[in-house]
Every structure is written in C-alpha cells, then in structure tokens.
Amino acid sequence: MPELPEVETVKRGLTPAMEGTRVTRLELRRGDLRFPFPDAFADRVSGRTIVGLGRRAKYLLVDLDDGNTLISHLGMSGSFRIEEGAASGVPGEFHHARSKDEKHDHVVFHLQAASGLRRVVYNDPRRFGFMDMVGRADLATHPFFRDLGPEPTGNELSAAYLAERFRDKAQPLKSALLDQKNIAGLGNIYVCEALWRSHLSPIRAAGTLVTAGGRPKAQLDLLVASIRDVIADAIAAGGSSLRDHIQTDGSLGYFQHSFSVYDRESQACRTPGCGGTVARIVQAGRSTFYCATCQK
C-alpha cells in the first residue's frame, strides 16, 4: 500500500497538471471503488476549478473553488496518469507501454487547462482505493482525519510530544509508531527504516524511551530525527515501488534500493561494524525487519 512518501510524490506530480484547471467533466466508469462514490459526485465536481492540491497522512486532497475538497485514497493499487489531449503528455508513452490495463481506469478528470484539454485518469485494479467529498471547513472533523496525529514532516512532531504519548506504555515501539493517532501517515516500511537508523528495537516497550518524570530520553530525540530523515529521503527518491505503486509520470520510485532493513531478511546488517543479520518477525500481522544485534 502506498505510504506517505508515495502519496506526496503523487501530489507533487499532479499539482502542475491539475492546479488552476477547470473540470469540464468528471467521468465515473463504475458506481464505486472500495466504497460507493458520494451522492451526485460527478455533478458536484464537474464545472468546478481546482484551486490546489494537498495531502494529509496518506490521503490526497483536491481543493475546489466552491469550498469543497475531494479526498482520494490510493488503496493497494491505485495510481494516476496524466494525458494531454488524445495522447500522453509524459515521456515514455507511460499510458500505453507502462500503465496498468486500461480496463481498470475507473475515474477520469476531463480538464480544461490554459494549454488545452487534459485528462487525469485514476486506475485501480484491486479497487481498494476510494474517494469522498467534504467541505474544507469540516475537513479536520471528517471521520478520516479527526483522530489523526501530527504529520511526521511537520513541526508538531517532537520528542516531547512522543514522550507524552508513550509515557508508561508497554506497547511495542513499532506498534506505537504505526498508531495513526500518534503520528499520521507513518507506515510499515518507513517505521522499520527509522527504527534501524535510530538503533531501536521494534519490540521494546514504547514507554522505555521516557524518563520517570515524563521527559524524552536522548534515544527518542534520535528517533524523531530518524523519522524525519527517512521520510525526506524517500520523498526525494520518489517513494518506494513495491508491487503496484507508480508515479504520475510512469516512473517507479527507487527508495527501495536504499532499504537498510526492510525486505532484507537474512542479509548482513548495514550498520558499520555491526556484524549482525537482518531478521524478520511478525507484529500485528505485519512483517517487521530489524537487526537484533544493533537495535536495542
């Protein structure tokens, strides 16, 4: 499933293609994705101008000129592609040679841009993604967002904040980091990578990173820095392409070539001088990769 860096990459790819354009028609080629589309969805979007794109956690946000925001979640296999006029406007004939089967094109944004007509197509073979619509003023209280913690890239995330959340918690550290109420948008891949960078075991209790007085230990400061760094590195690399993720220009993210522990079971740990081996365990139904030698 695309994680925060992948969704951020998609947002950055779509912004120059969609921002400032008018939706001449929203074409729905079926009645639902994972969930049914909102009532009168096509009518409510058609004719509107897109004033901006954003992201919250793993959700893509498309702001319209009437004060509404379209919410899109990519699910397991969702992706967008951009087409100029009747042909692709991206290098490599992405939508012909590199796209998924066009029979899985479920939503088409027909756009009028200053340069001419354009289409942005949502493709989703597994149909595990979904779309919704909400007034921008109500976004923070929408069920998708009201319980989310701070973004891992924002100033709200700090060691002091996590100390408050983790204090006296026996919950495994990895599980605490994946809890979207603690940090929004942080997923399995990047939690594994951040824990490796900060030399912390995924199975240790989250509360052990907090002093008896409730202050963050130095290890928690290092963890916050590692989270920021791994997310920034992944965004710079275009995200990770595992199974189904494709960027809007058809290219594949390549941060997976920089994985230090994720999906490296039985391989040598990359911490200099460690000498350990990457192990795989299962926590809450998800694979965890870590080095028991240097992650404590």
Swiss-Prot record:
Name the chemical reaction catalysed here.
Answer: Hydrolysis of DNA containing ring-opened 7-methylguanine residues, releasing 2,6-diamino-4-hydroxy-5-(N-methyl)formamidopyrimidine; 2'-deoxyribonucleotide-(2'-deoxyribose 5'-phosphate)-2'-deoxyribonucleotide-DNA = a 3'-end 2'-deoxyribonucleotide-(2,3-dehydro-2,3-deoxyribose 5'-phosphate)-DNA + a 5'-end 5'-phospho-2'-deoxyribonucleoside-DNA + H(+)
What cofactor is this protein dependent on?
Answer: Zn(2+)
Keywords associated with the record: DNA damage, DNA repair, DNA-binding, Glycosidase, Hydrolase, Lyase, Metal-binding, Multifunctional enzyme, Zinc, Zinc-finger
- InterPro entries to which the protein is assigned, alphabetical: DNA_glyclase/AP_lyase_DNA-bd (IPR015886), DNA_glyclase_Znf_dom_DNA_BS (IPR015887), Formamido-pyr_DNA_Glyclase (IPR020629), FPG_cat (IPR012319), MutM-like_N-ter (IPR035937), Ribosomal_uS13-like_H2TH (IPR010979), Znf_DNA_glyclase/AP_lyase (IPR000214), Znf_FPG/IleRS (IPR010663)
Disulphide-bridged cysteine pairs: none
GO MF, any single term: 8-oxo-7,8-dihydroguanine DNA N-glycosylase activity
- Family listed: Belongs to the FPG family.
Describe its assembly: Monomer.
- Name used for this protein in its record: Formamidopyrimidine-DNA glycosylase
